[in-house]
């Protein structure tokens, strides 16, 4: 079977859930200059064709720097914000205008290669961002550098209803006709909040947030962000992470940080369970809970491959329905990715840990340990003193977690009488 068939099957729930949802996407000026820009545009057009409502916010920092250099002007910054005097503002307007036209042209060109070939794609914009001056901070006059005052929510909403891609530039206008240079990250964050967007997607050079060892941090809650910000200091990665967290605290369901250097990063992040970058969300990504009758189908999908390999004892749907209350499960975005069951043994103070299984894609996240801990807690709550496990393949895993070799003779009579000598499972026990 071709790989794309399986991919499409797994992506179909996401395609459905993303339809008619508002996504605000921020692409910095460095991303527009990168060789992967064409692929990013293609992915955005594809996302639009699948029914997402897109607001694209672009940056322009390197383009402004280039124009300043061409005029022999030195850039000035204070607290990582550009000081925009009158000559600098001319460079900003020139850079932003040229960049906006280039992006619109690329979006129009990419339509021919998209699933919506032959349809009309509209890129819309205008004076949709009202701004105010930052003013004087610590004695430094920022001149024409501003901050977002208001997003024209109704105006953008009408454009999205007309199936336009809304393109916002890092410029804002005041009621008195002034123009202000804005940070694209701030524009994107405020747009996502004011539009009550489903997602804020932030492009950066890195794959996402990297921890101190350089490993990708795939998921974060907003309350976990401050510790990372302290470690990251004044880096651009910290700026992206802070914007992502602020958006979530203000009601945006999910913020994503992905790389503009990696082909297909956006699609991998939005249409796979593992994602491609860093996800920041208020909601719980995974839930460890007790199983209910509605979970039987998901349990069967999880354990069937292990049953076919002979690792787990086969259980029919009827058996699972009858014994569902014995199971604890780990659920991730509607998918059961791990399970374990506790069977108290009659006429004894012992129980059996059974059917411990973890989806192969999630076997290195400590979920087996979490389930074992939950089963032990449940066993203690029932007053059980000993926990038995019978296994044919995973003896070392249990021994590393405190289980000791035992024997069939040590099993309580009610369980020993059911022992399958043909399967010849090893018996281990652990005192609780």
From Swiss-Prot:
<comment type="pathway">
    <text>Amino-acid biosynthesis; L-arginine biosynthesis; N(2)-acetyl-L-ornithine from L-glutamate: step 1/4.</text>
</comment>
<feature type="domain" description="N-acetyltransferase">
    <location>
        <begin position="286"/>
        <end position="425"/>
    </location>
</feature>
<dbReference type="Pfam" id="PF00583">
    <property type="entry name" value="Acetyltransf_1"/>
</dbReference>
<dbReference type="InterPro" id="IPR010167">
    <property type="entry name" value="NH2A_AcTrfase"/>
</dbReference>
<dbReference type="GO" id="GO:0042802">
    <property type="term" value="F:identical protein binding"/>
</dbReference>
<dbReference type="InterPro" id="IPR033719">
    <property type="entry name" value="NAGS_kin"/>
</dbReference>
<dbReference type="InterPro" id="IPR001048">
    <property type="entry name" value="Asp/Glu/Uridylate_kinase"/>
</dbReference>
<keyword id="KW-0963">Cytoplasm</keyword>
<dbReference type="InterPro" id="IPR000182">
    <property type="entry name" value="GNAT_dom"/>
</dbReference>
<dbReference type="InterPro" id="IPR016181">
    <property type="entry name" value="Acyl_CoA_acyltransferase"/>
</dbReference>
<keyword id="KW-0808">Transferase</keyword>
<dbReference type="GO" id="GO:0005737">
    <property type="term" value="C:cytoplasm"/>
</dbReference>
<keyword id="KW-0055">Arginine biosynthesis</keyword>
<dbReference type="GO" id="GO:0004042">
    <property type="term" value="F:L-glutamate N-acetyltransferase activity"/>
</dbReference>
<dbReference type="GO" id="GO:0004358">
    <property type="term" value="F:glutamate N-acetyltransferase activity"/>
</dbReference>
<dbReference type="InterPro" id="IPR036393">
    <property type="entry name" value="AceGlu_kinase-like_sf"/>
</dbReference>
<keyword id="KW-0012">Acyltransferase</keyword>
<keyword id="KW-0028">Amino-acid biosynthesis</keyword>
<dbReference type="Pfam" id="PF00696">
    <property type="entry name" value="AA_kinase"/>
</dbReference>
<dbReference type="GO" id="GO:0006526">
    <property type="term" value="P:L-arginine biosynthetic process"/>
</dbReference>
<protein>
    <recommendedName>
        <fullName>Amino-acid acetyltransferase</fullName>
        <ecNumber>2.3.1.1</ecNumber>
    </recommendedName>
</protein>
<comment type="similarity">
    <text>Belongs to the acetyltransferase family. ArgA subfamily.</text>
</comment>
């Amino acid at each position: 079977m071709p790989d794309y068939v399986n991919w499409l099957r797994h992506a179909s729930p996401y395609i459905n859930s993303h339809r008619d949802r508002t996504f605000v996407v921020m692409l910095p000026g460095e991303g527009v200059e990168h060789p992967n820009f064409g692929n990013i545009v293609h992915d955005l057009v594809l996302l639009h064709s699948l029914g997402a409502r897109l607001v694209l916010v672009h940056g322009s920092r390197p383009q402004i720097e280039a124009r300043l250099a061409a005029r022999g002007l030195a850039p000035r910054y204070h607290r990582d914000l550009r000081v925009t005097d009158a000559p600098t503002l001319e460079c900003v307007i020139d850079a932003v205008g040229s960049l906006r036209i280039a992006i619109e042209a690329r979006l129009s060109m990419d339509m021919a290669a998209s699933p919506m070939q032959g349809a009309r794609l509209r890129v819309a914009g205008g004076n949709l961002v009202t701004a105010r001056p930052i003013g004087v901070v610590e004695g430094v006059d920022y001149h024409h550098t501003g901050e977002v005052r208001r997003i024209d929510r109704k105006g953008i909403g009408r454009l999205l209803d007309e199936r336009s891609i809304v393109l916002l530039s890092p410029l804002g206008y005041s009621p008195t006709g002034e123009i202000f240079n804005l940070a694209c990250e701030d524009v994107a964050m405020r747009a996502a909040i004011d539009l009550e967007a489903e997602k804020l997607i932030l492009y950066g050079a890195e794959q996402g947030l990297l921890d101190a060892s350089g490993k990708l941090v795939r998921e974060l809650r907003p309350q976990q962000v401050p510790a990372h910000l302290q470690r990251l200091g004044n880096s651009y990665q910290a700026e992206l992470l802070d914007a992502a967290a602020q958006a979530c605290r203000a009601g945006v369901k999910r913020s994503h940080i992905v790389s503009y250097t990696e082909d297909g990063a956006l699609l991998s992040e939005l249409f796979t369970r593992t994602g491609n970058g860093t996800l920041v969300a208020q909601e719980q990504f995974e839930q460890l809970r007790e199983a209910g009758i509605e979970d039987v189908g998901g349990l069967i999908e999880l354990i069937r491959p292990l049953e076919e390999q002979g690792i787990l004892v086969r259980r029919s749907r009827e058996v699972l329905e009858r014994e569902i209350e014995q199971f604890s499960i780990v659920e991730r975005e509607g998918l059961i990715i791990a399970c374990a069951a506790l069977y108290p043994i009659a006429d004894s103070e012992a129980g059996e840990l059974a059917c411990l299984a973890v989806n192969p894609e999630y076997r290195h996240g400590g979920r087996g340990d979490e389930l074992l801990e939950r089963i032990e807690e449940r066993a203690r709550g029932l007053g059980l003193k000993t926990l038995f496990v019978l296994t044919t393949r995973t003896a070392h895993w249990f021994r590393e977690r405190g289980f000791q070799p035992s024997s069939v003779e040590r099993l309580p009579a009610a369980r020993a009488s059911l022992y399958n000598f043909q399967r010849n499972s090893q018996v281990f026990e652990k005192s609780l």
